[in-house]
Amino acid sequence: MSTKPFRALAAAASAAGIFTYARYRRELRLLSESVDAGGTIAETSAGPIEYAETGDGEPMLVIHGAGGGYDQGLMIASDFGKDYRVIAPSRFGYLKTPAPEDYSPAAQADAHTALLSFLGIGRAIVVAASAGAPSAIELALRHPQRVSALILLVPRTYHPKQSIGADESVPSQVVLRIVEGSADFLFWLAMRVSRAWVVRFLGVPPEVERKASEQERERVSQLMKSVLPLSARVHGIELDGLTTISEWPLERIAVPTLIISAEDDLYKTLPGARFTAHHIAGAELHVLPHGGHLMVQQTATVSKLIKRFLAARKPKPASRKSAEIELVNA
């Protein structure tokens, strides 16, 4: 029996593998060059902090979530921050911001304040997504005079009976191990051959993402790519995993506050979002019926909510029952 067909098949598979890996190396190089060139290092009183900024107007500090960096912060603000001076830092351990011995949310909040001072900014709107929320809350508690408004998007917050994190499904846990192992190639490959697994790991029901528009699916693809290179973000991811959340004295927060979460967020941020809104006087809570942790197909709705909130903000009278809960049918 001739072995030529098997040799030909092996040669084709080898060529495909070489081509795939070469494509990965090229894309990773471009991503690395882009992220290396986009940030600036501020030598603050809290140590060096990488950041980027764009736009003019009222200052808006945008704090990224897990797996991010200043680039993710800019992406978060791209739909609603066009009329603002957006400042997007890389949190401790992400990209070029080193991790100090004290990497707690309180220390990170002090670092945010140090960056604002370095830039000559007295007060700023503070927007935080996911794992960026703890330091944003600490900022509002520790330095209230520096915060003009607080916006928390699918936030990691305290709840007495519920913690957040990747769901326990096999796909999510496999991708989690890839991320924890800083395996750039495996993550890149998973985006192409097991997209639904990565989508689920990022907190979105795969069927929600599949039904989204092509434009929205491309936004999800860009958010996926923003995790690369993992090797430049893995220390920050580790620190987020080590950070424990304790109950805050939320009743002390007096700035206008907007919180947005989703019913189907697989990271289960909604219970904590409700708890947080209930304990901050005058806070607004908006619950999206679908969209998951990335708020898929909800970009226009979220932007509208934020713009309306910022246009109408003013201090609310203190009340334990002041949280307004609204279901957004979008």
PLM region descriptions:
Residues 1-38, 118, 316-330:
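Short amphipathic, positively biased membrane-proximal segments
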Residues 50-96:
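Conserved HGGG/HGGXW glycine-rich cap/lid loop of the alpha/beta-hydrolase fold
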Residues 107-124:
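Conserved acidic catalytic loop of the alpha/beta-hydrolase fold
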Residues 150-182:
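Flexible "cap/lid" loop of the alpha/beta hydrolase fold
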Residues 170-174, 181-249:
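Alpha/beta-hydrolase
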Residues 253, 259-261:
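Short beta-strand/loop motif that positions the catalytic acidic residue
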Residues 266-272:
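Conserved alpha/beta-hydrolase "acid-adjacent" motif
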Residues 283-330:
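Catalytic active-site module of serine/aspartate enzymes centered on a nucleophile-bearing elbow/loop
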